[in-house]
Design a protein with these regions (language model features):
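ABC ATPase nucleotide-binding domain
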Residues: 4, 28, 64, 349-351
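Pre-Walker A (P-loop) beta-loop-beta motif of ABC nucleotide-binding domains
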Residues: 25-36
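The feature captures the beta-strand-to-loop junction immediately N-terminal to the Walker
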Residues: 38-40
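Helix-to-loop junction immediately C-terminal to a conserved catalytic motif
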Residues: 53
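Conserved ABC transporter NBD signature motif
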Residues: 61-73
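ABC ATPase nucleotide-binding domains
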Residues: 85-87, 91, 95-238
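Glycine/charge-rich catalytic "coupling/switch" loops of P-loop NTPases
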Residues: 232, 260, 265-312, 339-362
Length: 362
């Protein structure tokens, strides 16, 4: 079930100042997809989520879920949260410590006064789905973080909602468990073919979970795209920098040669794929991800995108070294294989993959 948002505005007043949490947001969330709202703290993503579920009242605009308007300032429509057919998984899970797993999951059905036989059947089916069969009588206080997250998911699923909304549900888990749980969560949601709206500030989480990502800043949607498009070929400088470590280099288009634009920059000429923004004379910004800057042998023949630089620092992070390289007066970030014989202070030869040097249009 899809969600349509038109002209949504929400402002707060703090210490006499007006803060626009949402500024004329227009957004269409497709049915049966995992749609992530990604952005830094204070960008408006949680406010937008709370407006969708009905926990916040917008100042103006319209929200429709499955074609039914649930909020409209112009037409005076407000459908209360409990009648919107939504469920929400919070950051804290909100698992009741005095209840066992069965009672936690069954609570939404008990609140609707469904027949006991139906409740038992639905809870059993849902616990099987989230791989918690046999945990029915386990006290909530005896569950691991990952198990609590699955109980919260089961409680959201058992009522068969039209849409599930997630407000940073993995942020309290340790790194390893977070990786395992986000894979499980994607598998669950993909199998169910349910519409999910997911809020996070974690870019890796967004890339791993999502079918579509909307990047927000200052109450506005800056860019929407599939994860690979957002990461490898984003349009906006802010998005390119936020979604992952990026080397941003300004320059001027000198010429276009054999489908590649030649950009004059502070470190020299850089070749990148031709695009509508690479007309000769145009001033452009290039984005080059660290993983597409490779260390080469010192005797590598001169060709496009070969540069010499000095290693300023190296940090070992397990699967690679994260290096800071100085080329002329420009500091760049790169990833270097852990087996490479490179040390801080070395002069090295670098190659920028031309097919992964992309021009930012905004």
């Amino acid at each position: 079930m899809g969600i349509s948002i038109k002209g949504l505005n929400k402002a707060y007043f703090s210490e006499g100042n007006k803060i626009r949490a949402l500024a004329d947001v227009d957004l269409t969330i497709p049915a049966n997809q995992i749609f992530t709202l990604l952005g830094p703290s204070g960008c408006g993503k949680t406010t937008l989520l709370r407006c969708i579920v009905g926990l916040e009242t917008p100042d103006s605009g319209e929200i429709a879920i499955g074609g039914e308007t649930v909020w409209s300032s112009e037409r005076g429509i407000f459908v209360p949260p409990e009648k919107r057919g939504l469920n929400m998984v919070f950051q804290t899970y909100a698992i009741w410590p005095h209840m066992n797993v069965f009672d936690n999951v069954a609570y939404p059905l008990q609140a609707r006064k469904e027949p006991k036989k139906d409740i038992i059947q639905k809870v059993k089916k849902t616990l099987q789905f989230v791989q918690l069969e046999g945990f029915e009588n386990r006290p909530a206080t005896k569950l691991s973080g990952g198990q609590q997250q699955r109980v919260a998911l089961a409680r959201a699923l058992v009522a068969e909602p039209k849409v599930i909304l997630f407000d940073e549900p993995l942020s309290n888990l340790d790194a390893k468990l977070r990786e395992e749980t986000r894979k499980e969560l994607r598998d669950f949601l993909t199998t169910l073919k349910i519409t999910a709206v997911y809020v996070t500030h974690d870019r890796v989480e967004a890339l791993a979970l999502s079918d579509l990502i909307a990047v927000m800043k200052d109450g506005r949607i800056i860019e929407i795209g599939v994860p690979k498009k957002i990461y490898f070929d984003s349009d906006h400088r802010f998005v390119a920098d936020f979604i992952g470590r990026a080397n941003l280099i300004d320059g001027t288009v000198r010429a276009v040669d054999d489908s590649y634009a030649i950009i004059d920059s502070s470190i020299g000429a850089i070749a990148c794929p031709e695009s509508p923004d690479t007309s000769p004379g145009n001033k452009v910004s290039l984005c080059i991800r660290p993983e597409f800057i490779r260390v080469m042998a010192d005797d590598t023949p001169q060709k496009r995108n070969i540069f010499r630089g000095k290693v300023e620092s190296l940090v070992f992070v397990g699967e690679a070294y994260e290096g800071e390289i100085l080329i002329e007066d420009t500091r760049l970030f790169t990833k270097i294989e852990p087996t490479a014989r490179v040390e801080a202070g070395d002069e090295i030869t670098l190659f920028f993959d031309p097919d992964h040097c992309f021009v930012l249009s905004k």
